Amino acid sequence: MNTGSRLAKNLSVRGNAVCGVGCYSAVIEKRDTDETVLKIGTTLDDPWLGYYQDVIVPLKGNPFLPKINHVREFFDCEDGYYIADMETLRPTVNTDLSDLCKEYVCGKVCSSELLSMCALREVENPDKLLSLLDKIIEQTDCFSYEDAEETLANISFEDSKFYRMIDLHDSNFMEREDGTLVIIDPWCNIDMSEVESLDSWWDEQRHG
């Protein structure tokens, strides 16, 4: 078990509520405030760090991006991990808009259709949503499992860590109290075979 995984599990044991768990990270509530949470990543190969560096920082202020106070990376003899301090969000109920985002990223609707549908839904700042989605598309290497398999056939496992596959499932959309949709994590690695996932631990905690 790597250091990041142990840290997330120890905080849970000490009574910090777990907001959510994914393959690479766990989001933990703070005891002293409900306005921000800690995102603990178990590996520095997590594509979310690329999202932070290549999208969140350049597009700072975009309302559809999570607000990040700081990200700190740590290295030890076993593996690297990171801790991000970020705003508290809630699961989205605005699935119409998140589905529209998925359709645009996958090429099923064009930009004019996206903007028209946003207008019908009275979405504020649709141009900023479009610019964010275009940035995600620009930074994505694979848009399907078929794309990933074809890419993997021509590169080494080590090189695969630098390739991003789109991963816009429902849990990667959240929202603020005012209902603003937030895209928290659009990518996964194209090769997940050696990822030490926290999902099994979280399932045991909830159902064991």
Predicted features along the sequence, with ranges:
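ATP-binding glycine-rich loop module of kinase domains
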Residues: G15-F75
